[in-house]
């Protein structure tokens, strides 16, 4: 991952500070599986939101269904469910994962995913564990390119916290 420093010395680039992607714009399991099935022999390249690629020798160590049940700051019970691809970068620098191999992992995960057409996220560990939405897959002549989009946090009960005219201001007291 290429990390750069901005004028204040903060580290940017790679996975940091990506523009957020609404969950509705994340690829679904069926769309990702279709893209993988269309080019099973091609190796995968995964691009950070800023266009840099993760290490080519990454592994997908888990394909899972993650359900998060929570109460937002306004007291509303909420649930999100996603398909999570956990990645790991090992020492085997000659390793390459193909679209067909990832498709096989999805087949093994079928009972866990339960037939739900969930939004797909990818999890990666750098200095911290970070998650991104998978937003697109593009077929090139020599590889399948998986594009990642950023996730973000937000107040889910803004209308209960403060008047909308004050949401952007300091000291609004939201949450």
Identify what each model region corresponds to.
Residues 55-57, 78-82, 115-117:
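Short connector loops at helix/strand junctions that flank enzyme active sites
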Residues 85:
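Glycine/small-residue-rich phosphate/adenosyl-binding loop
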């Amino acid at each position: 991952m290429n990390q750069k420093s901005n004028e204040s010395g903060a580290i940017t680039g790679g996975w940091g500070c990506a523009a957020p992607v609404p969950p509705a714009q994340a690829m679904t399991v069926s769309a990702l599986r279709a893209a993988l099935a269309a080019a099973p022999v091609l190796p995968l390249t995964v691009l950070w939101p800023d266009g840099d690629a993760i290490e080519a020798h990454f592994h997908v160590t888990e394909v899972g269904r993650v359900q998060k049940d929570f109460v937002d700051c306004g007291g509303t019970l909420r649930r999100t469910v996603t398909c999570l691809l956990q990645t790991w970068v090992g020492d085997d620098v000659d390793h390459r994962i193909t679209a067909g191999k990832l498709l096989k992992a999805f087949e093994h995960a079928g009972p866990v995913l339960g037939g739900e057409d969930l939004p797909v996220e990818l999890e990666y560990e750098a200095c911290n564990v970070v998650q991104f939405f998978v937003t697109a897959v593009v077929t090139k002549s020599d590889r399948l390119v998986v594009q990642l989009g950023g996730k973000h946090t937000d107040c889910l009960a803004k209308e209960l916290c403060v008047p909308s005219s004050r949401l952007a201001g300091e000291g609004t007291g939201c949450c």
